C-alpha cells in the first residue's frame, strides 16, 4: 500500500488510458475468439470475411452498430432508458482500476506499480461495483415499457442477489489467510503457494458464481432467447445495445482478472517459469497475468458451447441450496484451521489441503444432481399415484407452473386446486 499515492499526474492518466485500451482490445479479441471457437466446436468456419481470416470482424461489427439508426420505442421512460447502458458500462471499467498487472517498474525514471490504485478493502469495492452494474440492467428493462425486458431485469436482479452471497463467502477464506482485502497484498501473500491449492472449494464456488454474476451461458437467463426474445435489451438498438454488450464482456474480463488475482497468484509466474530469477520482475508479469485472464475467458467460451441453459428454478436452487450452504461450511472449516495455525499447530497446511480436497469433491459431485423443485405432478408420480385433475383435463392447454396469463384469460390454477375448491 505504500507504493500508491506518489505518482505524478501524467503517469496516473497514462495508467488509466492503458487500462481502457487493454479492456477495449480484450473485448474485441474475445468476441472474435468466442465466435471462432464456437464455430470450430460446431464444425463450421466462423467469421472469415472481414480482414485476414475474419480477424477484423469484431471491429466491423462495432462500427456497424455505432452507425446504425437508433430506434426509440414509444411508451418508455426516456431519461432512464438512455442512462441505463451508461450505468452498466461505468462500473465495469472502474472495477479494473484495483487489479494489479505487475510489480513495481520504472517508467521514464519514475518507480510505479502496474496498478492504477489500491484500497484496504479493494476486493469488497470490486464486489460492490459489480452489484451496481445490475442497476443498469434492471432500469433498462423497466424503462423499456415492455414485458420481456422487465422480466429479464427482474431475473438479473435475482441472480445478483443469489450469487453475490456465495461469491462474497468465497472471498472470506482468502481474506482469512491473506490477512488483507487489498488486491496487491493478496498477491504478495501468494508468493510461495497459490490459494487455488489451499482454498480449492473457494475457487470452485467463485468460478460458478462469476458465471452467474455475468449472465453468461448456462446462466444467461436474463436474456434467454427462447423465453424472453433478448431479455433486458430487447428494445435497445445501435450504440445503446453495443454498450450493454461491451459491459458484459468487460465484466467477464474483470471477474476473470479477479479470479487470477485471488487464486492463481495474480502476476506471479507459474511453475516452472518461476524458477527463472527474472520471471517476476520487470514487464514479464504482465504476460503471465494476461495468460491467466485468457484462460478464464476460454472457460466462458467453452461453457457456452457445451452446456445447455438451466431452468430458472434449477439455477436458483443451485445458488441457495448448494453454493451458499457449502460456502458457510467451508468458511467455518477454514476459520478453525486458521485459529489452530495461530495457536502454533504445526500441521495446519496438510489439514487445510485435505479439508479443501474433501469439500471440493463433495461440491463437484453434488453438481451432478439436477437442482429442480418437483411440482405436484412429479411428487405424485414418485409416490405411485395419479396426479389430481387440473386445468388440462378441462380442455385448456394451460401450463402447470406459474406464468403470466394470456390476455383475457385467468391465471392457471395449480394441480389439485379444483379438489380444494370443491371441498371448500
Curated annotation (Swiss-Prot):
One of its GO terms (cellular component) is plasma membrane. It comes from the Bacteria. Its EC number is 7.1.1.-. One of its GO terms (biological process) is aerobic respiration. The chain crosses the membrane at residues 11-31, 79-99, 119-139, 160-180, 193-213, 255-275, 283-303, 317-337, 347-367. Residues 376-424 are annotated as: Disordered. Pfam families: NADHdh. It catalyses: a quinone + NADH + 5 H(+)(in) = a quinol + NAD(+) + 4 H(+)(out). It is found in: Cell membrane. Keywords: Cell membrane, Membrane, NAD, Quinone, Translocase, Transmembrane, Transmembrane helix. It is a multi-pass membrane protein. InterPro entries: NADH_UbQ_OxRdtase_su1/FPO, NADH_UbQ_OxRdtase_su1_CS. GO terms for molecular function: NADH dehydrogenase activity; oxidoreductase activity, acting on NAD(P)H, quinone or similar compound as acceptor; quinone binding. NDH-1 is composed of 14 different subunits. Subunits NuoA, H, J, K, L, M, N constitute the membrane sector of the complex. NDH-1 shuttles electrons from NADH, via FMN and iron-sulfur (Fe-S) centers, to quinones in the respiratory chain. The immediate electron acceptor for the enzyme in this species is believed to be menaquinone. Couples the redox reaction to proton translocation (for every two electrons transferred, four hydrogen ions are translocated across the cytoplasmic membrane), and thus conserves the redox energy in a proton gradient. This subunit may bind ubiquinone. Belongs to the complex I subunit 1 family. PANTHER family: NADH DEHYDROGENASE SUBUNIT 1 (PTHR11432), NADH-UBIQUINONE OXIDOREDUCTASE CHAIN 1 (PTHR11432:SF3). This is NADH-quinone oxidoreductase subunit H. It comes from Mycobacterium ulcerans (strain Agy99). The gene is nuoH.
Amino acid at each position: 500500500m505504500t507504493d500508491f499515492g506518489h505518482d505524478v499526474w501524467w503517469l496516473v492518466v497514462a495508467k488509466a488510458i492503458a487500462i481502457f485500451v487493454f479492456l477495449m482490445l480484450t473485448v474485441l479479441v474475445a468476441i472474435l475468439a468466442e465466435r471462432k471457437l464456437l464455430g470450430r466446436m460446431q464444425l463450421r468456419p466462423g467469421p472469415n470475411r472481414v480482414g485476414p481470416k475474419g480477424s477484423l470482424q469484431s471491429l466491423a461489427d462495432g462500427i456497424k452498430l455505432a452507425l446504425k439508426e437508433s430506434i426509440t420505442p414509444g411508451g418508455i421512460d426516456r431519461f432512464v432508458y438512455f442512462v441505463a447502458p451508461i450505468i452498466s458500462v461505468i462500473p465495469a471499467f472502474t472495477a479494473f482500476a484495483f487489479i494489479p498487472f505487475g510489480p513495481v517498474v520504472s517508467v521514464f525514471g519514475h518507480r510505479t506499480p502496474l496498478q492504477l490504485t489500491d484500497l484496504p478493502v479493494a476486493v469488497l469495492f470490486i464486489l460492490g461495483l459489480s452489484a451496481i452494474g445490475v442497476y443498469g440492467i434492471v432500469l433498462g428493462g423497466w424503462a423499456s415499457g415492455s414485458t420481456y425486458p422487465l422480466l429479464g431485469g427482474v431475473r438479473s436482479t435475482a441472480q445478483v442477489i443469489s450469487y453475490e452471497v456465495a461469491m462474497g463467502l468465497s472471498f472470506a477464506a482468502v481474506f482469512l489467510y491473506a490477512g488483507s482485502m487489498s488486491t496487491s497484498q493478496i498477491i504478495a501473500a501468494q508468493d510461495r503457494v497459490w490459494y487455488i491449492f489451499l482454498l480449492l472449494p473457494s475457487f470452485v464456488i467463485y468460478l460458478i458464481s462469476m458465471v452467474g454474476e455475468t449472465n453468461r451461458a448456462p446462466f444467461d437467463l436474463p436474456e434467454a432467447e427462447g423465453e424472453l426474445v433478448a431479455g433486458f435489451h430487447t428494445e435497445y438498438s445501435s450504440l445503446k445495445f453495443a454498450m450493454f454488450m461491451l459491459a458484459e464482456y468487460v465484466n467477464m474480463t474483470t471477474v476473470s482478472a479477479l479470479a487470477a488475482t485471488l487464486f492463481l497468484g495474480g502476476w506471479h509466474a507459474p511453475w516452472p517459469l518461476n524458477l527463472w530469477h527474472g520471471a517476476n520482475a520487470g514487464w514479464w508479469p504482465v504476460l503471465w497475468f494476461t495468460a491467466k485472464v485468457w484462460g478464464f475467458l476460454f472457460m466462458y467460451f467453452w461453457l457456452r458451447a457445451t452446456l445447455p441453459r438451466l431452468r430458472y428454478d434449477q439455477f436458483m436452487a443451485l445458488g441457495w441450496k448448494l453454493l451458499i450452504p457449502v460456502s458457510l461450511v467451508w468458511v467455518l472449516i477454514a476459520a478453525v484451521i486458521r485459529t489452530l495455525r495461530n495457536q502454533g499447530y504445526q500441521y495446519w497446511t496438510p489439514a487445510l489441503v485435505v479439508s479443501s480436497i474433501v469439500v471440493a469433491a463433495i461440491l463437484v459431485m453434488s453438481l451432478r444432481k439436477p437442482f429442480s423443485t418437483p411440482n405436484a405432478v412429479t411428487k405424485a408420480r414418485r409416490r405411485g399415484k395419479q396426479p389430481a385433475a387440473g386445468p388440462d383435463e378441462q380442455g385448456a392447454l394451460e401450463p402447470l407452473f406459474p406464468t403470466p396469463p394470456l390476455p383475457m384469460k385467468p391465471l392457471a390454477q395449480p394441480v389439485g386446486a379444483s379438489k380444494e375448491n370443491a371441498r371448500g
